Amino acid sequence: MNILITALEQSLIMLPLILGMYISYRILKITDLTVDGTYVLGAAVFARTIPFGLFHALIFAIIAGGINGSIVSFMQRNKRINGLIAGILANFMLYSVNLQIMQRPNISVLGMPTLLSILDLDNWLVPLILINSFIIVIVLILLKGNLGLFLRAFGFNKDLLIDLGKPAELYRMLGLSISNGLAALTGTLSAQVNGFADINMGYGVALVGIGAIIIGRQIFLNNINNFNALKEIFACFIGILFYFISLSILLHIGIDPINLKLILGIVLFISLSSVKREDL
C-alpha cells in the first residue's frame, strides 16, 4: 500500500509536466527536450522568490517557464533550427541561467510557506490532487476549445493552417509556452515536496515524460483512434503512475539504485520500439 501511495504522490508531482509534454509531443508534434531545464528553472525561480509569498513565487515560476517556451519557439520559427536541436541548445544555455538565478547549485526552501503549510495538512496527497484537478480542467478546456483545435491542426499539417490564413507560428509559441509553463510548475511542486531546488534535478525528466505518454497510450488507448481529451489526459496519468510504481517495486525488491536508470531505460526502449512510427 505504501508503494502505491508513494508512486501516486510522485506521479501527481510530475503530472503537470507530463501534460505539458503531451501538448508539445502529441499535439504540436514537437519533441521539446527543453523541459529538463525548464523544470529546474521553475524550481529556481520559486526558491528565489518565495520570500515575496507563495502564490507570487508560483506565478513568477510559471511565467518564467512560459517565456522560456516562447524563446524556444522563436529558435524553431520558420524551420530556423530543428526542434530537437533547439531543445538541446536551450537546455545548454539554461544551465547557466539557472545557476545565475540560484547563485549556487542548491537552495533549501525548508521552513518556507508551501501549499501544505497554507492548507494546514499532514501530507502532500490532498494538495497535489487539488492542484492537478485544477490543471486538468484548464487543459481540458484548452484542448476542447478553438485554441486546442488550432494546436492540433499545427501538429497535423502546419502548411494547411497557413493556407487557411492562421498564424501558425503564434500557435507554436502558445503551445510551447503552455508546455514549458506546466514544466516550471512541476519544478515548484518538486521543490516544495523535497524541500530544495537543485541545479541537476531536471536530468532526464523529458525522456521520462515521453516514455510515460507512450506507455500510457499503449495501456489505455491502444485500440482508440478518435481524439478524446479526457482519455488522453487519463492515459498520461496512467503512464506516469506505471513508471513510478515500477520504480518503487524495483527499489522494494532490492535493486541497486545505481542500476535503476539502466533497467528503466531498457523498459522505455522496449516500449518505444514496439510503437508504430506514426504514433511516436
From Swiss-Prot:
The keyword Lipid metabolism is assigned to this record: no
Keywords carried by this UniProt record: Cell membrane, Membrane, Transmembrane, Transmembrane helix
Topology term for the membrane: Multi-pass membrane protein
Main location: membrane
GO molecular function: transmembrane transporter activity
Membrane-spanning parts: 3-23, 52-72, 81-101, 123-143, 196-216, 233-253
Key word Membrane present: yes
Annotated localization: Cell membrane
InterPro entries according to UniProt: ABC_transp_permease (IPR001851)
Signal peptide interval: none
Database matches in Pfam families: BPD_transp_2
GO annotations of cellular component type: plasma membrane
Top-level taxonomic group: Bacteria
Protein's UniProt name: Uncharacterized protein RP368
Source species: Rickettsia prowazekii (strain Madrid E)
